[in-house]
Regions:
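Buried hydrophobic-core signal for structured, non-transmembrane domains
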Residues: 68-75, 126, 140-149, 266, ...
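Terminal connector regions
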Residues: 131-164
């Protein structure tokens, strides 16, 4: 003890030590006095302030949970208050509520004696999952969160719309199945059209795909949309945060050996690879895929990907995809008439051109490659948006005519290079042509050819004798 005392004597004189000891005693007593519990007062005249009077969810597919939404309740009083009860009104209904709430971090559909400090706030988190019923059209699902103090109550309304659907989950589809627009189609974990079978998708059909889901086709795919009622394919997250997010689902995959595909009036968005074509027909002169009046937009990797395929496309718009809008690899034959391939004003960091084509050898065999591009637009923010890779041993032949191409290389038949086609509003994904566009009335009249497919444009407007280049006709 003497050692301890002597060790500190030179640091703290006796008088100073006494004062420090006294100060410590005072602090202890102050601390004890400050440990009184906070008081929370129940008040029948309490007036809570709500951040909103309604929480609105977008239309939800039945069985699919919503995103979590939140709102706040404020205590504007200068004292702590006690809320008698916070509860979900529909909890006592038969079958319960479609909604779930979390009260300031506590998952519960009802809490009593909820404390709220002076000039503080309370978080309420809300989710909803809607059960199916017999309705074909969207239906309303409501509830409310109620706050009760004494005789006073305040309620925040919860509003969502449910949409029934037909669900498929990791299955081989019935042979020669037809999907129609009676109810939306929802695909979980992918589906397969078997060899020798055909899937027909009628006009106006909406198809929603869960994350990482694909439509695989070993047989034949027939998409029969119309300009007024296109077939729509999307991811199944419909809320604003996710509905325009690229990579929300995989895409259509036309497998090797499949053939006879016809795609009319399809609006496909937000996939990973929009349409992938692996098919190599036995007859080298046949066509795997015919595409007409189709839009492919905002795919995370490639809009249209083809391996040694044969594709004819008319009035097709492929826009703002992550790596390529179109990529043809290991050769193939590709004929595009009145098509637009464009990448502008997207959130992607781009390191690849809009349009790529390669004759790479496959299994040490040459891959002949043929490209026809007529009355078309290939445009983007890079200096060279059309790249032909001739590293393979197969021949490459091209027929490029009456087209505007953003390219460093002058290719035979290209009408204009480095000439901005002046899209009307690309920031809003409007790739129609502005009034003073050099693409206006610069095309060759193809209306009498190719089965009349080019008499009208992507949105069914009549084409002029001197047509606008690209998928969309400029109407004066």
């Amino acid at each position: 003890m003497r050692l301890f005392s002597s060790a500190f004597a030179h640091i703290f004189p006796k008088k100073a030590a006494f004062h420090l000891f006294g100060a410590a005693i005072i602090i202890v007593f102050l601390g004890v006095g400050g440990c009184r519990p906070e008081r929370f007062v129940a008040n029948a005249d309490l007036e809570l302030r709500c951040e909103t009077d309604t929480v609105l969810f977008d239309t939800l597919l039945v069985g699919a949970g919503s995103i979590t939404k939140r709102f706040k309740i404020y205590n504007d009083e200068g004292r702590n208050i006690l809320i008698d009860e916070v509860y979900l009104a529909g909890r006592i209904q038969s079958g319960g509520s479609a909604y779930r709430i979390n009260i300031n971090g506590i998952p519960a559909n009802a809490l009593t004696e909820v404390e709220l400090r002076a000039r503080d706030s309370l978080y309420i988190f809300v989710e909803v999952t809607i059960d199916p019923n017999q309705q074909n059209t969207p239906f309303l699902v409501t509830d409310s969160v109620v706050f009760r103090s004494g005789n006073r109550t305040k309620a925040v309304q919860l509003v969502a719309y449910g949409q029934n659907a037909v669900f498929f989950n990791e299955e081989v589809l019935d042979c020669n199945m037809v999907w129609d627009n009676t109810l939306p189609i929802v695909v979980y974990n992918s589906v397969l059209v078997d060899s020798g079978c055909t899937l027909t998708i009628r006009e106006g059909t909406r198809v929603y795909f869960n994350k990482n889901s694909s439509l695989f086709v070993e047989g034949t795919l027939r998409i029969e949309g119309t300009p007024a009622q296109p077939v729509r394919m999307r991811g199944d997250r419909l809320d604003p945060l996710y509905r325009d997010l690229a990579g929300g689902w995989n895409g259509i995959h036309l497998l090797r050996g499949s053939t006879g595909h016809r795609i009319e009036n399809l609006d496909l968005r937000n996939g990973t690879i929009g349409i992938r074509v692996d098919s190599l027909p036995a007859d080298a002169d046949s066509v795997n895929v015919i595409i007409n009046k189709t839009r492919i937009h905002n795919c995370a990797v490639v809009g249209l990907l083809a391996y040694t395929a044969r594709i004819d496309a008319y009035n097709m718009l492929v826009s703002n995809c992550g790596l390529y809008n179109f990529l043809g690899d290991y050769g193939g034959r590709y004929r595009f008439r009145h098509c637009t391939f464009v990448h502008l004003n997207s959130g992607f960091q781009r390191g690849y051109p809009v349009f790529g084509l390669s004759n790479r050898d496959y299994n040490n065999s040459p891959s002949p490659t043929h490209l026809e591009l007529e009355n078309s637009l290939v445009w983007g923010s890079r200096s060279n948006e059309l790249v032909l890779d001739s590293s393979g041993s197969g021949t490459i032949t091209t027929l490029l005519s009456y087209s505007i191409i953003q390219s460093e290389t002058q290719r035979p038949g290209v009408q204009l290079r480095y000439t901005n086609p002046k899209f009307k509003n690309p920031s809003d994904n409007d790739f129609s042509i502005d009034t003073l566009s050099p693409a206006f009335q610069r095309g060759f009249d193809l209306r009498g050819l190719y089965g009349g497919r080019l008499q009208t444009d992507l949105i069914d407007q009549a084409r002029a004798p001197s047509p606008t280049l690209g998928a969309l006709e400029r109407i004066e």
